[in-house]
């Protein structure tokens, strides 16, 4: 994007969360441009003159510039923001996500962002905050987010640094259930080997054949446990998913699960 087009006023409601123009017409706009351009000389100058804007949150998603460097995978300004004191445990106003949860949320993200955030004091057991939006029935931790991606190296790093493998949110979701629901069985097997509770339901299956007038208020449906879900899985025989599904089933049988 050219500098001229970037300066053109835009409706922030139409911008995605990767767009630095979210900071247009805010006190942090000049800093946002320096961060996007990775202009460290101008970055240092702006911060020295107005250090408090480093944690400014744009109005649509409530993201800070640190969050945008993670989303855009810009390591140089990411490190610079941290060195200047950017807050690592601030939550945005969209899903209540923090920098660390964001850094763990995509298999395409470099794990170095997560490692550096931990070095700077990010809460490894952070939890998304606030009420859930209507279309969002999750409340993630870094480990839950990582488990959904299938990035085993990232999951290993989090667990080895104290991530809670058995946190369960109000929707009954856990790192184990997230890995199973996304067919990331290699991650699920690792979690089980590191103490994940296999006795909790993976999800609840609602019986839609029951008329609404006959349904029981608050009934979540039939609890589907890990062995139930795996027995229904139809992974192809020669895939990693099938291999690790078999390992999980063997593990469960060793624990007396039928």
At which residue positions do the language-model features occur?
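Ankyrin-repeat boundary/"N-cap" motif
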Residues: 24-31, 56-65, 91-104, 127-142, ...
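Ankyrin-repeat intra-repeat helix-capping/turn positions
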Residues: 38, 73, 107-109, 150, ...
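Conserved ankyrin/ankyrin-like repeat signature
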Residues: 42, 76-77, 112-113, 153-154, ...
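Ankyrin repeat domain, specifically the short helix-to-loop turn at the C-terminus of the second helix
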Residues: 47-53, 79-87, 115-124, 156-164, ...
């Amino acid at each position: 994007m050219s500098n001229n087009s970037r300066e053109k006023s835009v409706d922030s409601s139409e911008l995605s969360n990767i767009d630095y123009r979210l900071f247009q017409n805010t006190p942090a706009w000049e800093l946002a441009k320096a961060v996007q351009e990775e202009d460290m000389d101008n970055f240092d100058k702006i911060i020295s003159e107005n250090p408090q804007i480093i944690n400014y949150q744009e109005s649509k998603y409530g993201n800070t510039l640190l969050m945008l460097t993670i989303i855009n995978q810009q390591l140089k300004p990411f490190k610079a923001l941290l060195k200047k004191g950017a807050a690592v445990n601030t939550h945005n106003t969209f899903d209540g996500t923090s920098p660390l949860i964001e850094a763990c949320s995509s298999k395409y993200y470099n794990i170095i962002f997560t490692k550096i955030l931990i070095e700077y004091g990010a809460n490894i057991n952070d939890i998304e905050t606030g009420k859930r939006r209507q279309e969002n029935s999750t409340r993630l931790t870094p480990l839950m987010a990582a488990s959904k991606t299938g990035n085993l190296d990232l999951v290993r790093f989090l667990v080895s640094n104290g991530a809670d493998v058995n946190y369960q949110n109000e929707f009954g979701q856990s790192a184990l259930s997230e890995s199973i629901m996304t067919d990331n069985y290699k991650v699920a097997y690792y979690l089980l080997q590191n103490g994940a509770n296999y006795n909790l339901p993976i999800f609840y299956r609602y019986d839609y054949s029951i008329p609404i007038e006959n349904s029981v208020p608050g009934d979540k449906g039939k609890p589907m446990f890990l062995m139930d879900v795996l027995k229904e899985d139809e992974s192809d025989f020669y895939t990693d998913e099938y291999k690790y599904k078999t390992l999980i089933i063997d593990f469960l049988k060793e624990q007396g699960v039928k």
